[in-house]
A protein has these predicted regions:
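N-terminal Rossmann-like NAD(P) cofactor-binding subdomain of oxidoreductases
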Residues: 2-193
């Protein structure tokens, strides 16, 4: 049984992860961390889990009781968390945010700075299964990257892609997480393409 800790468990990603893990035969959720919801039932925040679990959010982070922790923070918070907290080396980390998705040597101009150095392995099993299997730190790819890579991978393996590929992708309102922003509110995104 893999013992799991979830940080940032009250957000959309945390809720979906809890939903996937509560009935997983090989996983046990030891803690679901959310400082703002500590003491509340998970199902009070993630209403779709009502009747599925009696798990409560906690402000505690007992790393010594888990085998793996999932970072379900907003983008840009995972790196800061690792700088501020001492996670034992034997605890695996799977980051579901964007902080460690790109290799340190990748030069990308974005609104979010890429960490200067890290040892996270790109976590798309269809292309990186052997490295993920032995990795201590895994960076889960984003929804667009996953969709594009899984869609193109069969054609690429068969040598059918002979030129650049252009992708037009559209995201829903939940793609930016729960925290409101000027361009992420439903009223801004609704019927706005």
């Amino acid at each position: 049984m893999v013992k799991v800790g979830i940080l940032g468990a009250a957000g959309y990603t945390g809720g979906e992860l809890i939903r996937l893990l509560i009935n997983h035969p090989e996983a046990e959720i030891v803690f679901a961390n959310s400082e703002s919801n500590a003491g509340n039932l998970v199902a009070e925040v993630h209403e779709g889990l009502y009747g599925e679990t009696d798990l409560k959010f906690t402000a505690e982070m007992p790393f010594d009781q888990v085998d793996v922790i999932f970072f379900c923070f907003g983008h840009g918070k995972s790196e800061a968390f690792l700088k501020e907290h001492n996670v034992p080396e034997n605890v695996k980390i799977i980051d579901l945010a964007q902080d460690f998705r790109l290799a340190p040597e990748t030069v990308v101009v974005t609104q979010q700075p890429t960490p200067a150095a890290h040892d996270f392995v790109y976590g798309l099993p269809e292309i990186n299964e052997s490295k993920i299997a032995v990795a201590q730190h895994v960076a889960n790819p984003g929804c667009f990257a996953t969709c594009i890579q899984l869609g193109l991978l069969p054609a690429a393996k068969m040598g059918l892609i002979n030129s650049d590929v252009s992708v037009n992708a559209i995201t829903g309102s939940t793609g930016a997480g729960q925290k409101p922003g000027a361009t992420t509110h439903f009223s801004w995104r609704n019927n706005n393409m």
